[in-house]
Amino acid sequence: MDSRERVLASINHEKPDRIPCDLWAEPGVWERLKKDLGAESEEAVRKALEVDIRYISPRYPPDTLTNGVKQNMWGERWEKTSTIFGVEWEHTRGVLFDAQSVSDLEAFPWPTCDQVDYSHVAEDVKRCEGYAVFYGNADFFERPGLVRGLENIFIDVMINQDMVDYLQERFVSFFIEDFHRSESTP
């Protein structure tokens, strides 16, 4: 049973030959795993640990860096912080944290799929043959929480539902188009 078959068996409530394995890690953890396993790359770590899932995504525009704060196309922001594993990027207030109305949300320069490079997606899928493939990161709740602030999203659900609806529409529409474009790459 290969990794793809193993994950599909589990999803279908069938018994796999072993429990499927996945791995997400921060940069400091990847470095430690590479060192401890004598691995040259993250992919070598995945193979050594028999990780069954591979992640692919299109290439998004590069993050910007202003005054030590990194921001992506969605307005998610990170600041460097020291941890016991080294310096990591930690989420900080997103660009829409102080928005008070739908018009404030509308004023943000929302990204479009035209800014995204899909040219390598088909090749990445081929490279992952035999593995379960997870595409993209269409997180319709977490991402709005990162650009708006999770606490603000919870408050908005109670008293600013129009803002929640607007954010959900923006993200869902983007990711539906994103999936369609990734499917249609040669």
Question: Where are the regions that the model predicts?
Answer:
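Catalytic cores of TIM-barrel enzymes
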Residues: 1-186
